[in-house]
Structure formats: C-alpha cells, structure tokens
Swiss-Prot record:
Alphabetized SUPFAM superfamilies for the sequence: Glutathione synthetase ATP-binding domain-like, PreATP-grasp domain, Rudiment single hybrid motif
Record domain ATP-grasp: where: 107-313
EC class name: ligase
Matching Pfam families: GARS_A, GARS_C, GARS_N
The keyword Manganese is assigned to this record: yes
Reactions catalysed: 5-phospho-beta-D-ribosylamine + glycine + ATP = N(1)-(5-phospho-beta-D-ribosyl)glycinamide + ADP + phosphate + H(+)
Originating species: Halalkalibacterium halodurans (strain ATCC BAA-125 / DSM 18197 / FERM 7344 / JCM 9153 / C-125)
InterPro entries from the UniProt entry: ATP-grasp, ATP_grasp_subdomain_1, PreATP-grasp_dom_sf, PRibGlycinamid_synth_ATP-grasp, PRibGlycinamide_synth, PRibGlycinamide_synth_C-dom, PRibGlycinamide_synth_C_sf, PRibGlycinamide_synth_CS
Protein known as: Phosphoribosylamine--glycine ligase
Taxonomic lineage of the native organism: Bacteria, Bacillati, Bacillota, Bacilli, Bacillales
Pathway: Purine metabolism; IMP biosynthesis via de novo pathway; N(1)-(5-phospho-D-ribosyl)glycinamide from 5-phospho-alpha-D-ribose 1-diphosphate: step 2/2
Cofactor annotation comment: Binds 1 Mg(2+) or Mn(2+) ion per subunit.
Amino acid sequence: MNVLVIGSGGREHTIAWKFAQSEKVERVYVAPGNDGMSDVATCVAISEQDHDQLVAFAKENKIGLTFVGPEVPLLAGIVDRFQEEGLRVFGPSKRAAEIEGSKSYAKQVMKTYNIPTGSYEVFTSFDEAKAYVEAEGVPIVIKADGLAAGKGVVVALTNEEAIAALDDMLNQDKFGGAGARVVIEEYLEGEELSLMAFVHGETVIPMVGAQDHKRAFDGDQGPNTGGMGAYSPVPQFSDVQLKQAVNEILIPTARALMQEERSFTGILYAGLMMTADGPKVIEFNARFGDPETQVVLPRLKSDLVNVIESLLDGQEPELEWDEQAVLGVVLATKGYPGSYEKGYTISGLEQLEDDTLVFHAGTKREEEELVTNGGRVLLVAKQASTLREAQAAVYEELNKVKSDGLFYRKDIGSKAIAERAVSSQTEQ
C-alpha cells in the first residue's frame, strides 16, 4: 500500500522512516516534508493546511493510510475531512484534538473526571490574573490557552517573571489568539515523563516512556523550546509507576473523551510529573511528541502499519519493544527559540556511522549543499544497551557534524545517567 504522512519535521521523518520498514508499504509520501527525508520518502509540495489538495493527492495516488503528524492540521479538522471523503486516516477529529488545542478545556476534563493534575484557574483579564498570582505566590506556571508551538509555557520563579509573562500574553498579544486566555496552575515538583499511547475509542495501547529536555541550554537553563533532546527508557520510573500512569491517566482520559462525545483516535501524549502523590498531568497533546518520537519509534519492533490498521479494525495490537536505550540530541539554529537566520551550511553527516539515526527537521538542499531551514534542524540519535553508552556514542558522532550556525545541549540524559549510577551503588 501507499502511505501519506502529513507534516514536515523530525517527528514526521521518523514516522516515514518507520513506515518505510513495513513489508506492506510500497511508497511513503510526506506532505510537505523536507529535503532531508528523501532517504525514506517522496516529498510532495502540498502545505499541511491545504486540505483540498491533500485529499485530491490521497485519491489520485491510492493512499491506503494517512498519518497526521502535527497539531495544527488536526485542530483545523483534517481528519474529519479525510473521513468525509472515505479515506483511511489515523489521528483525532477536530473536537477530540481540543484536548491539546485548549489547555483550559483539558483542565476542565481532568477536573470533571478526576484525572490527577495540578490546581488551576483560567483568566482573560490581566488585572485579575495579576491579583491571583500575587495572592498565590511563586513558583507558579503560566500557560497560553491555545497552540504556541511548545513555547507558550512560563515557569515563573519570581513575581516579576510571572507578571511579565501575563503582560506578554494578555496585553502584548505575544501568542495572538492563543494567549488571549491563560491558565495559571500550581507548580508541581518531581520528575517529568512523556508517555504516549495508540488510542482508538476506549482501547489504549501504551508505548515505552521517554523524557525530553525543554530548556534551550545546558543545566536546564534558558527559555522553553519545542524540545532539545530526549531519551528512552526513563530509568527514574519503575514499571509499576508506568502502569499506574496508564491506569490512572491515559485510560480514564480516553474514557472521558468518549463521555464528552469526542471519541479519540490517534496518538494521545501525556506530559506527566511524577510527584510525591503519584503521577499528575502537566499537559496533553493529540499527537506524537517531538523529539520523543525520535527515540521511541526506533525501539518499536512491531510493524507500524499493522499496529495502526489492527487498532482501526477494532483489535488490540500487542507491541514488541527493543530493550536497548535510545538517546537523541537536537541541533538547533543559533538564536532559537527566538529569531534566527536560515541558510547555514551543514557538513559531516556523510561521515556518521551507518547505525547512527539522523532525523531532519529543518534542512534544505541548495545545489549540492545541505543548509539550515528552521529553528530545530536535525536530531542525531544512537541506540545502545545502556543510556550511558548511547549518550557517549551520540556526542562522539556530533563532533563530526560541522556548521557555523548550529548549537546543541551537551547534557542530554546526564541527570538520568547520574541518578542511575547512584541507585545502582545503593543497591549493591
């Protein structure tokens, strides 16, 4: 069969790469894709917003399955449109995707259905929000209600930071309509976990856990980004804790969305904090995380097409996972997540080892050269028997990649590796 992946980033490159391994798949198309994906897919110059063209392309090219990568087309109703046209598609409807599209709606669902999360209030008035922050005190978390490409969250450690964030969102329109309403929530302490699942109605098939690194710079410094690296598994969490998160959060959320008449089909992503009181939800996404996908899908031994098709056919597929660890580091353009230039030359990728995974997010071919064409540009990952080995291998490979315009964090996975070392010493 032919499959179509909608999107253009590193996540979509990974999904296309996984589809290309399936014996069922003849051709993988990605719309619009990027030039770095041509190893596994044919890129099609159609915007992810152009529903008419995408539908026409799917019909003309006998696409047997379409997979929607990013959140923006999901919230624009691309899945509803494909279904109306009789095309098989994997992703949530517009109504179901609101679990990501509106943080206040997600919070309301959690409150109604007793899904563990931090306490919160919603504001549209700057003065009321400011008064609330001053009454509650810091640290406190301020979030734009709508989509802000992973950058609409501020963990304010001082009153000044909190008020500046509220001013940005409610007065300065920093995120446009997405920030016209803000969610102010309790600051949760603990270890973070990204837990994703294949979902169809009440059927929830969890994946292995991952942890991403949101801050731009080493030591978790700097502004929030879409994610600067990730690893899987997450040794800080036991199998019992992962099972608890599935039973107390993922399954009840799928059931809650059924109750809300917003039945969810697709990838449900829970960003969790493992607190002293157990797992609590920080956020939901209605799609694969980026960069978590780039370290989770390489561990999936099962055929991705079989998993999705059996789920859509009402079955419960069993997933087979590789025990090995995967650690990936994002190379981003200097200036990201703020303003940055494009067009920096990238060299050295051809010198990387054959088993090194390279997923392209923002690259472009100009004549014979590969150049930067986005904020997050590449993710380089390695698979090894331990996180420590995977980390050492990745950073050795990154020494071969040359570009004047790129930076990356030097500490992806370090905290987990250090904690692992301490726990194994105490076990001896």
